[in-house]
Amino acid sequence: VLRLREAARGERVMRVFINGFGRIGRSVLRAFLQDPGRWPGIEIAGINDIAAPEMCAYLFEYDSVFGPWRGKVALEGGALVVDGRSIPLHRTADLSRLDLAGIDLVMECTGRAETREVAERGLVAGAGRVLISGPSAAADVTVVLGANETALTGQRIVSNASCTTNALAPLARLIHDRWGIVTGSMTTVHCYTGSQPTVDAPAADYPRSRAAALSMVPTTTSAARLLDRVLPQLAGRIVAQAVRVPVASVSCVDFHLLTEARPTVDEVNAAFRAVGGVIGWTDRPLVSTDLRSRPESVIMACPETKATPGGMLRVFGWYDNEWGFSNRMLDMAMRLG
């Protein structure tokens, strides 16, 4: 059970600690501070990263994708101060060395929580629960909002899956519930990430050894494997692949599938327009940069929907792989509280 304390004005407060202040950790903080009213009762109570505090402050203030922070950012007495709000900064590679007895939830954003020993360091330090910002076999459960949130039953280590799975799973759940999915294939056209080099360099995956900004790079994605965990009723029915492209932000899922029923394009688009929540939609002829900073998990491009009389269906969705996912981290924190 999370330890919730009473705020001075009588509201319950959930104290959240961000471990790892990289792309997702910083985006989580930016999203929260831009609109804290969306997540009432959450307090960002601390940040930990192995980088120097000065670098943490600099990278938060000046962001190459989302632009500079419009308010004031400073370092004061070992804390990051944003528009007068002070957040303690820590610098350790081993989270279990900290005293987190007053923390309700650790957002594990280092990208390294692949083993149980690493994933539970926040618990060892005294925190109530851990939310991992990526796939992890060490998690007690993998949850995607809009797909399987009912799987949350008090588990202490929760994986928020991946940005691509958060885009794919709600679409697959809606389509399967309405028309039945026989089989399908999803390709994510994904912007480059920090896992790729800026110049050719050795890597375990040969295509990913090539300069990220110079080529389209066919590679793998964990989305199909994670979809099997999130929606076991579709286990083995969906294959997935990725193409990394020279774009800094916003990706898309191109989902082709065979359905049991025979929906029309209008029926499919009407269903996506009506659902709301983590699924957005657009009728406009947009390109990727137009979807930057959209908070939804996926935004359906209705003009791209295609259907054949034989049951072949194609749906296409945009997603800001950093901003949308960071919003889901905060939404999931609310669920866990």
Positions of PLM-derived features:
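Generic structural signal for residues in well-ordered beta-strands
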Residues: 87-89, 238, 315
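Short, conserved micro-motifs enriched in small and acidic residues
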Residues: 158, 162, 166, 214, ...
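C-terminal active-site/capping subdomain that shapes the small-molecule cofactor and substrate pocket
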Residues: 240, 252, 256-337
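Active-site-lining helix/loop region of Rossmann-like oxidoreductase modules
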Residues: 15-19, 23-30, 74, 173-276
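Short, Lys/Arg-enriched N-terminal segments with co-localized hydrophobic residues
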Residues: 1-13
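N-terminal Rossmann-like NAD(P) cofactor-binding subdomain of oxidoreductases
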Residues: 10-209, 331
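Flexible, active-site-adjacent loop/turn segments at secondary-structure boundaries
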Residues: 57-60, 64, 93-98, 141-143, ...
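Structured loop/turn residues at secondary-structure junctions
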Residues: 110-111, 163, 219, 260, ...
